[in-house]
Amino acid sequence: MKFTKMQAYGNDYVYIDAIHQELNNLPELARFVSNRHFAIGSDGMVLICPSDKGDFRMRMFNPDGSEGEMCGNALRSVAKYVYDHRLTDKTELVIETLGGMQKLKLFIEEGNPPGIRREDVVEGHGYAANIQADIGEPRLDTKVIPVAAELPQFVEQPVQVNDRLFHMTAVSWGNPHCAMFVENVSELDVEKYGKSIEYMTELFPNKTNVTFVEFVRRDYLKIREWERGTGETIGCGTGCCTAVVAGVLTNRCDRKVTVEQIGGPLEIEWDEETNHMFMKGPSHTVFEAEIDVSQIM
């Protein structure tokens, strides 16, 4: 099986062209390739598939084999993948996900894409150096997210988690997220609280991604992310967007914010006119290779 390892702010996935390769037993395949000790190692597996609704379809699997609805960093990386591998010449794409149709804009630089061996250079094609994703409007309806609460929206609501009280804001990008502000995010026991909140199914029936946010200034936030089905990751695009939604709704931050993750800063803008959320940043190809998966397939 041919694959490409890519990362965006340290959020690394194994990307597989499922247009030209036939794949089976996907949950087991995701568990296998994601294993950092016995296989490739990643935050999950992403398939690039054909789509009847958009230019391409993205399927994302977590390391535990569960299928996720959306991931902002993976989405941007898919856009880079299809352009850099010359599956398209378009610089504006619509990609189908379980979380909905997503619009992306690619910013092209000349030359061959780093990390991809190319004998021939296509004049004027270049490679995607930066990718902006329009992931649409944040969904705040508790029934949509879902949150088991008798409230139309779940904003800055007090929730006791183990020995600590958090004030949570919940949002969906096609997958459930919640965010809460803390004093010093670098000193927080993210595994302790993140895992407890993820599995708080009496509040989040489908479990949830968890974003811990530290206020630095109105145009700068810091986060740490606990991803549903994955654990702590050093980058999460939708987590950054969730932090900005929570910050704007509680008047802590502006609509255009740099969000610092462990893997690096991501530019986020919640456009007031369209109500759409935009994230912009690079994605990088780490390497390409083949692996024998005959024991799984």
Where are the model-predicted features located?
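Juxtamembrane transmembrane-helix boundary motif
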Residues: 92, 101, 127-161, 165-168, ...
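A glycine-rich beta-to-alpha transition motif near the start of alpha/beta enzyme domains, typified by
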Residues: 1-127, 178-297
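N-terminal, positively charged, Ser/Thr/Ala/Gly-biased leader segments
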Residues: 1-22, 133, 147-171, 297
